């Protein structure tokens, strides 16, 4: 590189660095005007700034008036002429009235700036949330692959809240303080430039301390937040997958990880508290030291004036300067600046940092943007071939692990192409590349000869439909979910107004209220009727219309979040209907019928092949019987194409495909392949069984939704009302282990409260000592003595604040840590039914751990320390005032009820506002979280604009309601701020009257005045802190209710219950190890079991079920989707309890026994393979028996048996490879095999397999079966399966239909005598 180029590069580097510095310096200003503010926003911003600045002027004006009053009082004290008394009183009355006028102006200005900033902050938060949400909808899939679990939800909640807090009324408070600061210095220099100049040294001292203290505070706060975010992610995954956590009793392992992260946060939080404590102590030390300096220097000026007889420098003038630059800062800025402005700087910085992080995501230009509309670069030929030319691909999160390696393939237009192969061979990746969810690393994907990178993404996706391996539905009605497939259809653009205007939602609501679907359609117009007709036709094609017709609400039925209220098979049918409704030119099916039983699958497959005749169809499948009629079958292995051809050609070549077919062939004798007419009749009845089962399955899930609508039972709900006394009583055991630090904190807080009144005594005597009635030497002597007293108070204040803030911070972090750990434990101890009812979503439950845990600082942290100091000062000030001058004190205290009343109303209205605010935006938040969780589905269907419109509609009502509530709540805040000014006017008027009358001296008056002035200011501050206390009490009540549930509804076995009086410190410690159990199979019996979900007692999911499995048997459960098979597994795990009958394991009724320690002998592999964020080693180890930490050898053995060990060791980091949030860094087959390894590492006596190999190819499945046979010798195994070849060797197969066991026997026996079983088997056979 040449010298010139090096200089150029260095210059560019400096320029980039300068730009970053400028952007960082201006980020807060950019935040205020970000996201296209409207005229209303700009008006609110302008009003807020001007009113806040103007509100800083009245108090300095009062300083001038107070100085004049001091001169008046001095004159009255020195002059005993009674005739002059009335003249002095008249002057005092005039000035007191001016204080009233100034107070009224202050109240009006405060209300304007608080209301303006609050409303501005609320509107900015909504704009940012929408802008960030809109940017998320633009991002490509790779962006979300690298996003930790729950981060998007956290950004949309806590991060936006952080920004809102940093752009609301706190900005006005700081502007008010800065305005006061500037105005005070201007007046001070005008009044006495010399003394003002001497006190300028305060400013750099404050700035230096704030900068250094702020650096360390921010450093520790960032470390704390990082660890809290990590712990929240662990909790979110655990709450979202409560079934797995319960089944493996994995509470302790996840709790250990959760507590470890919180432990790090606790250490950082304590260091942050110490940093803030030092900062607070130094601020008061500087202020009181400056007070002493000012009075000492001021006394010299006054003494010189008295000695020279020069009236130019009066006590009032000196008092004005000292009051504005020192005392005013103590009583005004330092009360609202030390305790508020300094922390506010951190709040603003946090808002700026958070905004910068959000802005980076918002401004991120996605490589694939599916939101751009227009006809430019549209797909010209929609009937051309799809080709992959030398395509290589690796996921951005793992660039060193290629998924596709130089792949070339062609999918002919108008034909059916099938892609098969081993798990992890890249089949689903091909589908993602064709739909342009990702772009290839090398090579190109072309559609009709056009590179799809050159095409408009929406245009490309408008001509295809993708049904993914794990279908995702939105929390809407069946009607709306299917109609979503029409959103970006080029042939149905005329239907857009009806699709996007909310009409379908209104129709679905009407149907749920008993109205007829077609009548409602006609009412809403021809376009709507056309949409509904197309939806019904698509449902027919997807074999979904029958089960939809059986539902009470039909097409108006809500499917729940992510389709949680319907079965997997029903979700797949609705997803297929959604993809077929627009009759796409290209249909991509990625294991689209894997969750269906064979009969349903056969019908759906036939319907798809019929409707896609002459169109392009790409199928990805592991069930090879579903693709044997394909025009071309492409076989993949390890990211490469190994062979292709028709089914017969590939069988003839006897290659990899033929081997897979042989592995899946069922053992059916040739003579049994001829199906009689009676068999076909039986097939019809079998179809009826399927539909009944589907209806029952949906009923059981909808029962959970019904339960949610009923609301929580106060006797068993975390939101139950709790009395204040019982809440306070429960705080005692929490604080008991920390009594030493609590004693230090309380003692220090008492000292802080006492020093305020002590400073009033010193101040009053100082004013009296500097009276011009005294000699110059006496004034100088008083200045030195009382200056020293202020310095002593400064030292006391430093150590008292240091002790109070650090000790209360230490206690707060300890309590927060324990409460969060115990809350997590209590949540995970509740049974599955509790988690799935009463609207207890993982997000809602997580808020107890995060928001409620954090809110407790209002009862244990610096907030409560400040309030205690204020209350102590209140008592001392009132007592001192009555002792010194009770006549003055009584009148001044007359306004206290008004102040307290305003403060109480402020707390009440603010609490109500916060509760309504949280409820108002629940729906909109739910939309954003759901969209992020279903982002691939939204991208594939081009739903970004529709989702954004739905989000905006959800905000209209809440935004107006919140604005009205905010205006009312802020009125009381302004009153609580402004009422203290009227105390000043009353105090000076009445005090002057008493001094002129000779009842009290000037010293007595100023002691009472300063004591009550400080109290008045502190009371105002206490009311600003009161919402924190209110939030803390609400949060504590919820937490205590939750901990109470831990002792009443616990199903998690031998952990110590949280009984009253138990040591919470001990409760938060890790649990004791459980003893290992003996090996060998165990018996399982279900005796006349009936089961209904409590909210739907009239719907029997299981109806008199009898099953008996001997120790060591391999038992299988088969039957149509929704027949109750998975419910049986849930009952065996005691995730639910039977309505009647009993479940016996090893001869013991598990419903009658206490605890669930029997689960130690059971391992469970769910249908949906769930992994947690963490390493492969961590995830497999979660399956170990509680209290046992598996060795590396045990983990590797389990992985070998699950046929995943070789895959793991080929990864760059081996067993230390991070699985990613919800295991998103692994393929479906890899996740499933790890889930099996997790079960096998337990070495259970009973192994439960629920469709545990549905995501595996035939070869992987065969190897896994061999491993399972080896691992489960002597073990009892219960397997649920749709693929009958996986359970051919079962000792006994139970045929479950309509909640009953209709037959049992071996595979050969059931093929011989059960027509429904034989038909199912024939559908899966090749020959």
From Swiss-Prot:
Residues 47-326, 743-1031 form the ABC transmembrane type-1 domain. GO terms for biological process: oligopeptide export from mitochondrion. Pfam families: ABC_membrane (PF00664), ABC_tran (PF00005). It is a multi-pass membrane protein. ATP binds at residues 421-428, 1119-1126. InterPro entries: AAA+_ATPase, ABC1_TM_dom, ABC1_TM_sf, ABC_transporter-like_ATP-bd, ABC_transporter-like_CS, P-loop_NTPase, Type_1_exporter. The keyword Repeat applies. CDD domains: ABC_6TM_Pgp_ABCB1_D1_like, ABC_6TM_Pgp_ABCB1_D2_like. This is ABC transporter 1. It comes from Ajellomyces capsulatus. The lineage of its organism: Eukaryota, Fungi, Dikarya, Ascomycota, Pezizomycotina. The gene is ABC1.
């Amino acid at each position: 590189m040449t010298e010139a180029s090096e200089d150029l590069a260095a210059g560019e580097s400096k320029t980039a660095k300068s730009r970053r510095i400028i952007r960082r310096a201006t980020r807060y200003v950019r935040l205020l005007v970000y996201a296209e503010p409207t005229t209303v926003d700009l008006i609110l911003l302008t009003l807020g700034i001007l009113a806040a600045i103007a509100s800083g002027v009245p108090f300095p004006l009062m300083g001038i008036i107070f100085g004049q009053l001091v001169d008046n009082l001095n004159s009255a004290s020195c002059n005993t002429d009674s005739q002059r008394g009335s003249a002095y009183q008249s002057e005092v009355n005039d000035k007191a009235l001016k204080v009233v006028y100034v107070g009224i102006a202050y109240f009006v200005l405060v209300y304007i700036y608080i209301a303006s900033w609050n409303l501005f902050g609320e509107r900015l938060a909504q704009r940012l949330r929408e802008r960030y949400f809109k940017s998320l909808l633009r991002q490509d899939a790779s962006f979300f692959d690298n996003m930790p679990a729950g981060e998007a939800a956290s950004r949309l909640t806590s991060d936006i809240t952080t920004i809102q807090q940093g752009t609301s009324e706190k900005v006005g408070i700081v502007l008010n303080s800065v305005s006061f600061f500037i105005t005070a210095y201007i007046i001070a220099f005008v009044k006495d430039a010399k003394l003002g100049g001497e006190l300028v040294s305060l400013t750099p001292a404050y700035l230096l301390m704030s900068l250094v203290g702020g650096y360390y505070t921010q450093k520790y706060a960032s470390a704390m937040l990082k660890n809290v975010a990590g712990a929240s992610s662990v909790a979110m995954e655990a709450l979202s997958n409560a079934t797995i956590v319960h089944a493996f009793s994995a509470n302790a392992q996840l709790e250990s990880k959760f507590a470890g992260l919180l432990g790090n946060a606790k250490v950082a939080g304590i260091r942050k508290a110490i940093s803030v404590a030092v900062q607070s102590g130094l601020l008061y030390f500087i202020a009181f030291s400056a007070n002493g300096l000012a009075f000492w220097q001021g006394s010299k000026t006054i003494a010189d004036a008295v000695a020279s007889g020069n009236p130019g420098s009066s006590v009032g003038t000196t008092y004005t300067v000292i009051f504005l630059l020192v005392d005013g800062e103590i009583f005004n800025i330092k009360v609202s600046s030390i305790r508020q402005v300094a922390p506010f700087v951190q709040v603003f910085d946090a808002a700026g940092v958070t905004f910068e992080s959000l802005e980076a995501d918002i401004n991120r230009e996605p490589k694939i943007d599916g939101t751009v509309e227009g006809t430019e670069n549209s797909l010209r030929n929609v009937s051309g071939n799809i080709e992959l030319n030398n395509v290589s691909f690796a996921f951005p999160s793992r660039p060193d692990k290629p998924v596709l390696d130089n792949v070339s393939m062609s999918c002919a237009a108008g034909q059916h192409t099938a892609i098969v192969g081993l798990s992890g061979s890249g089949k689903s990746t091909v589908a993602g590349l064709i739909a342009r969810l990702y772009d290839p690393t090398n090579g190109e994907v072309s559609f009709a000869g056009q590179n799809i990178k050159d095409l408009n993404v929406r245009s490309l996706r408008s001509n295809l439909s993708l049904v993914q391996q794990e279908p995702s539905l939105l929390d809407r009605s069946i009607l709306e979910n299917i109609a979503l497939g029409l959103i970006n259809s080029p042939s149905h653009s005329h239907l857009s107004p009806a699709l996007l205007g909310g009409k379908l939602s209104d129709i679905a609501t009407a149907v749920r209220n008993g109205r007829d679907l077609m009548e409602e359609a006609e009412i809403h117009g021809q376009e709507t009727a056309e949409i509904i007709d197309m939806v019904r036709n698509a449902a027919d094609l997807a074999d979904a219309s029958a089960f939809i017709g059986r539902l009470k609400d039909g097409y108006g039925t809500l499917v729940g979040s992510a389709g949680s209220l319907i079965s997997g098979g029903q979700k797949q049918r609705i997803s297929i209907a959604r993809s077929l409704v627009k009759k796409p030119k290209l249909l991509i099916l990625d294991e689209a019928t894997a969750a269906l039983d064979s009969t349903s699958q056969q019908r759906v497959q036939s319907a798809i092949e019929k409707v896609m005749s002459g169109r392009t169809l790409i199928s990805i499948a592991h069930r090879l019987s579903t693709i044997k009629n394909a025009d071309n079958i492409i076989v993949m292995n390890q990211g490469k194409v190994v062979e292709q051809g028709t089914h017969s050609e590939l069988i003839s070549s006897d290659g990899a495909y033929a081997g897979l077919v042989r592995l899946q062939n069922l053992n059916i004798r040739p003579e049994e392949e001829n199906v009689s007419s009676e068999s076909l009749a039986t097939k019809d009845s079998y179809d009826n069984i399927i539909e009944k089962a589907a209806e029952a399955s949906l009923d059981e899930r909808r029962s959970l939704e019904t339960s949610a609508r009923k609301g929580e039972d106060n006797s068993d709900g975390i939101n139950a009302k709790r009395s204040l006394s019982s809440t306070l009583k429960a705080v005692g055991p929490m604080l008991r282990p920390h009594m030493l630090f609590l004693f230090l904190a309380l003692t220090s807080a008492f000292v802080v409260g006492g020093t305020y009144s002590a400073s009033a005594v010193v101040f009053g005597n100082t004013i009296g000592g500097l009276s011009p009635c005294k000699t110059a030497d006496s004034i100088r002597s008083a200045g030195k003595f009382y200056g020293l007293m202020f310095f002593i108070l400064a030292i006391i204040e430093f150590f008292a604040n240091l002790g109070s803030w650090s000790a209360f911070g230490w206690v707060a972090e300890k309590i927060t840590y324990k409460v969060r750990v115990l809350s997590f434990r209590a949540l995970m101890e509740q049974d599955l039914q509790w988690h799935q009812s009463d609207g207890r979503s993982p997000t809602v439950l997580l808020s107890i751990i995060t928001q409620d845990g954090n809110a407790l600082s209002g009862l244990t942290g610096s907030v409560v320390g400040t309030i205690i100091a204020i209350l102590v000062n209140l008592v001392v000030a009132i007592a001192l005032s009555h002792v010194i001058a009770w006549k003055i004190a009584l009148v001044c205290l007359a306004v206290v009820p008004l102040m307290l009343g305003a403060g109480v109303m402020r707390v009440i209205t603010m609490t109500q506002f916060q509760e309504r605010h949280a409820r108002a935006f629940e729906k909109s938040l739910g939309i954003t979280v759901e969209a992020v969780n279903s982002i691939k589905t939204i991208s594939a269907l081009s739903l970004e604009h529709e989702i954004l419109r739905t989000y905006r509609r959800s905000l209209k009502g809440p935004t107006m309601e919140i604005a009205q509530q905010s205006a009312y709540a802020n009125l009381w805040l302004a009153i609580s701020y402004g009422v203290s000014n009227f105390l000043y006017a009353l105090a000076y008027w009445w005090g002057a009257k008493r001094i002129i009358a000779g009842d009290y001296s000037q010293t007595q008056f100023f002691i009472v005045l300063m004591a009550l002035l400080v109290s008045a200011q502190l009371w105002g501050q206490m009311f600003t802190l009161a919402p924190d206390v209110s939030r803390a009490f609400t949060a504590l009540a919820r937490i205590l209710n939750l901990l109470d549930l831990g002792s009443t509804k616990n199903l998690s076995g031998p952990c110590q219950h949280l009984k009253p009086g138990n040591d919470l410190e001990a409760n938060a410690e890790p649990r004791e190890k459980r003893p290992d159990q003996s090996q060998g199979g165990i018996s399982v019996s279900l005796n006349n079991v009936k089961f209904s979900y409590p909210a739907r007692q009239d719907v029997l999911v299981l109806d008199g079920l009898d099953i008996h499995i001997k120790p060591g048997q391999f038992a299988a459960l088969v039957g149509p989707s929704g027949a109750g098979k998975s419910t049986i597994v849930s009952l065996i795990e005691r995730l639910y309890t039977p309505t009647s009958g009993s479940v016996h394991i090893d001869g013991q009724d598990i419903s009658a026994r206490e605890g669930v320690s029997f689960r130690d002998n059971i391992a469970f592999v769910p249908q949906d393979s769930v992994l947690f964020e963490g390493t492969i080693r961590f995830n497999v180890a979660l399956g170990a028996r509680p209290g046992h930490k598996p060795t590396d050898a045990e983990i590797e053995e389990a992985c070998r048996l699950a046929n995943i060990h070789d895959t793991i060791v080929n990864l760059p980091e081996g067993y230390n490879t991070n699985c990613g949030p919800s295991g998103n860094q692994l393929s479906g087959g890899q996740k499933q095999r790890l889930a099996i390894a997790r079960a096998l590492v337990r070495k259970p006596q009973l192994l439960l397999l629920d469709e545990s190999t549905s995501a595996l190819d035939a070869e992987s499945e065969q190897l896994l079966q061999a491993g399972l046979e080896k691992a489960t010798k002597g073990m009892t195994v219960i397997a649920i399966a749709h693929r009958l070849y996986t359970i051919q060797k079962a000792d006994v197969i139970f045929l479950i239909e309509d909640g009953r066991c209709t037959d049992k026997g071996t595979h050969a026996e059931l093929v011989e005598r059960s027509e429904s079983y034989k038909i199912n088997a024939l559908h899966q056979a090749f020959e």
